[in-house]
UniProtKB/Swiss-Prot annotation:
InterPro entries given in the database record: ApoM (IPR022734), Calycin (IPR012674)
Disulfide bonding pattern of the chain: 23-167, 95-183, 128-157
Main location: secreted
Family: Belongs to the calycin superfamily. Lipocalin family. Highly divergent.
Biological role: Probably involved in lipid transport. Can bind sphingosine-1-phosphate, myristic acid, palmitic acid and stearic acid, retinol, all-trans-retinoic acid and 9-cis-retinoic acid.
Protein name, UniProt field: Apolipoprotein M
Residues annotated as binding tetradecanoate: 136, 143
Key words of the record: Disulfide bond, Glycoprotein, HDL, Lipid transport, Secreted, Signal, Transport
Assembly and oligomerization: Interacts with LRP2; LRP2 mediates APOM renal uptake and subsequent lysosomal degradation.
Amino acid sequence: MFHQIWAALLYFYGIILNSIYQCPEHSQLTTLGVDGKEFPEVHLGQWYFIAGAAPTKEELATFDPVDNIIFNMAAGSAPTQLHLRATIRMKDGLCVPRKWIYHLTEGSTDLRTEGRPDMKTELFSSSCPGGIMLNETGQGYQRFLFYNRSPHPPEKCVEEFKSLTSCLDSKAFLLTPRNQEACELSSN
């Protein structure tokens, strides 16, 4: 009898706790309209890296020396290619240019990075206006990255990202300082 009462109390406690602290199911994350054939134009253009989250600090360590990053996504020479250019402003003031080519995976929402066969990127919608979320997985790491069209999105957007990713087992969180002016994004 005692065990049944205890089990019932724990059950109701769980229901109450779940109603207060609701985490969405992972399946409730909405993948963006990537159909494996062509990248939607709405996602092309300029993006700012705002925040990252991961199960451990080590998975975000690559962003520790970063002040801000500005990206430009453009359609590639083939409809299944996406060209990504970035300029990284380091905390010491240096500007570091980078380029990637993503390949759309037919029949999937995954993006594969050219030259990095172990890396998989999934894009998700964000409830934040002008926001997008990526889930990057590779050999020994998984991280969620939040981007926005504005270098300074509303604080509630960052809080929503942090809350969502903590529900997805991310214990480490990184917010880019964005104290310095963004570096000029090269056109080539």
